[in-house]
């Protein structure tokens, strides 16, 4: 007599429920086939259930939200907690701390099959093997409408076992480098007199993933003005532009004084299959800059029953800011599939960001290291951007073209416009012309800056080197790359000038700033303190580099690169903008020379984006962020849709 595979599986399930005729059997099941439910009637979750692979095996979630902001209420404002107390307190309070189930919607299901014939003395036990895994995993049993914690010594009765157990599993933490890899083997043991049976199922905690630009933006973040008219204008413009892009959620404003909102956290998520689609917990990833207090606020202000947060401890510097983290959208290449895309981060002379290994430990968005040693800030967002597209790949790459940027100025000069102002930005309402000083250079004067053309040729070469890496890793072709004109100059040398001295500014003790801005007077060399800048007043907020510096002596020796040759955007870098919708990008206004009524840089940028089927909305960031060595993207953040499968 022959049986089909399906009939054999059904027979096996029936045998599992027969105790005395065929011996005691125990069966525990999870969503091994990842269809969002546990199959207790068929065989779809039986095969290979004891082994976890990237292609098959049950998933569960780190339940690290903060329902009702219980922890935030206990802590109080982040600025009230002295740094001497350390940052470990942030890890010690979330929904998975202790053995109370505060957020059951993030439990992954486990089921045991009913065992009909058991004596009254039969007992059952469910536990996780491996001490490390057991310390990271929680199991609960449903009793009525409540969930009861199943500890190592918890015993199930014969009555419990006869009906089958409805269990749930969650994790206390995420995958960690050189720590727990997220795997858990759950064992189910039943004993009845002299008989004993055991079974197991393999699971793994879902990875923490970062967003890519094919996922539409759902919320925008920035930092409040705190009575600063410049930041206030930036925020007002951002709110207007986010609404114009169709984003319904109001812009979330942090109240921590750190205007570099892109840099102190990376919005992410973790998800598993559910019966009605992915079950998702948003996860805010703090930058690996433990002395950057603003990073605390993703725990204090953003966590709730649908949002969690994680931190990977370390005292990073500017390349550890999360502006130095972007995500290549999903793709397949050379037999490899990246359904959640891949992360890119810039490295300095082989020194990777401290978060790199944490991201690698998630084992889904295998990070790629690019070269940003030529940039003073060192962020990948300074020269590239991914855009959604209706092409076969689903996305394209936009990159800076410094040679084209210089050529725009040279062409204007050749056509007789060399004496025109190189920077067209006017003073806006509320900007005192003395305090908020604007550069007066002409096009020809900019072109005569020391090594201006050769510097931009070097920048172009370094960008091409990074494009080569992306081509090698993704199969990207030249037809999928769009180049926008841009210019760079030495970050710690004379560039734009302004006839204002520190004594004319609001802070008489200030000294000249790093960046392509200079003020008359003796050179002080590279410095990272607050400055008066040639492109504006004393910069009221910390520069993007200052904000990233570790406090105290921990940062000594970190900037081992040759900073005197490092570059920063000369005109506002339009690639360093925010993708808000599938045809809407918010870019910093470049304020290029105006010839025949048009900003020649803005026009060229718009034409390039139009070829990629995108409309550009420009937003001024000259005084709010550009003079501090950043742009619109650096001063904002976004979280995006999370409904796509990564498994």
Features from the language model and the residues they span:
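Histidine/cysteine-enriched polar flanking segments
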Residues: 20-647
């Amino acid at each position: 007599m022959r049986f089909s595979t399906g009939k054999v599986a059904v027979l096996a399930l029936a045998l599992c429920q027969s105790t005395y005729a065929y011996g005691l059997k125990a069966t525990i099941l999870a969503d091994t086939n990842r269809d969002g439910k546990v199959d207790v009637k068929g065989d779809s979750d039986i095969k290979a259930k004891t082994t976890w692979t990237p292609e098959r095996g049950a998933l569960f979630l780190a339940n690290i939200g903060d329902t009702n902001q219980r922890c935030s209420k206990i802590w109080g404002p982040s600025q009230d907690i002295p740094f001497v107390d350390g940052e470990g307190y942030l890890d010690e309070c979330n929904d998975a701390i202790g053995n109370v189930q505060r957020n059951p919607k993030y439990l992954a299901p486990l089921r045991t099959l009913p065992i009909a014939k058991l004596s009254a003395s039969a007992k059952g036990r469910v536990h996780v093997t491996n001490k490390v895994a057991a310390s990271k995993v929680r199991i609960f049993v449903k009793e009525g409408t409540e969930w009861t914690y199943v500890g190592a010594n918890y015993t199930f009765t014969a009555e419990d076992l006869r009906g089958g157990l409805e269990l749930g599993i969650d994790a206390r933490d995420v995958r960690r480098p050189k720590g727990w890899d997220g795997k858990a083997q759950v064992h189910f043991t039943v004993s009845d007199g002299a008989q004993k049976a055991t079974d197991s199922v393999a699971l793994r905690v879902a990875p923490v993933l970062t967003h890519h630009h094919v996922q539409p933006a759902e919320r925008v973040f920035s930092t409040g003005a705190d009575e600063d008219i410049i930041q206030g204008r930036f925020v007002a413009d951002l709110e207007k532009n986010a609404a114009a892009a169709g984003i319904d959620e109001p812009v979330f404003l942090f109240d921590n004084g750190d205007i570099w909102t892109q840099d102190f956290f990376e919005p992410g998520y973790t998800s598993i299959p559910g019966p009605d689609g992915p079950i998702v917990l948003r996860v805010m990833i703090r930058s690996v800059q433990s002395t950057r207090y603003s990073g605390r606020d993703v725990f204090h202000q953003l966590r709730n029953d649908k949002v969690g947060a994680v931190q990977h401890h370390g005292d990073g510097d500017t390349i550890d800011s999360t502006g130095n983290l972007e995500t290549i959208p999903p793709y397949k290449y050379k037999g490899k599939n990246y359904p959640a895309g891949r992360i890119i981060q810039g490295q300095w002379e082989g020194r990777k960001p401290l978060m790199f290994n944490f991201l690698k430990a998630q084992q889904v968005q295998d990070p790629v290291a690019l070269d940003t040693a030529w940039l003073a800030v060192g962020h990948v967002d300074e020269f590239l951007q991914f855009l959604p597209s209706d092409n076969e790949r689903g996305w394209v790459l936009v990159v800076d073209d410094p040679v084209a940027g210089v050529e725009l100025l040279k062409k204007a000069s050749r056509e007789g416009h060399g004496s025109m102002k190189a920077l067209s930005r006017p003073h806006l309402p509320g900007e005192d012309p003395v305090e908020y000083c604007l550069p007066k250079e002409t096009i020809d004067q900019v072109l005569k800056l020391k090594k201006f053309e050769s510097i931009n040729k070097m920048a172009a070469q370094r960008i091409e080197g990074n494009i080569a890496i992306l081509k090698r890793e993704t199969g990207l072709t030249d037809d999928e790359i769009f180049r926008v004109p841009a210019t760079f100059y030495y970050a710690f040398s004379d560039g734009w000038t302004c006839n204002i001295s520190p004594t004319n500014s609001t802070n008489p003790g200030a000294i000249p700033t790093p960046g392509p801005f200079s003020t008359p007077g003796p050179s002080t060399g590279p410095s990272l303190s607050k400055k008066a800048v040639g492109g504006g007043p004393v910069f009221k907020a910390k520069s993007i580099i200052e904000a990233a510096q570790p406090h105290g002596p921990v940062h000594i020796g970190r900037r081992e690169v040759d900073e005197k040759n490092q570059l920063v955007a000369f005109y506002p870098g339009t690639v360093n903008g925010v993708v808000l919708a599938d045809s809407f990008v918010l870019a910093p206004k470049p304020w290029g020379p105006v010839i025949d009524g048009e900003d020649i840089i803005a026009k060229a940028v718009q034409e390039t984006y139009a070829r990629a089927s995108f409309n550009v909305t420009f937003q001024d960031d000259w005084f709010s962020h550009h003079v501090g060595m950043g742009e619109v993207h650096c001063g904002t953040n976004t979280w995006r849709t999370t409904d796509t499968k990564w498994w």
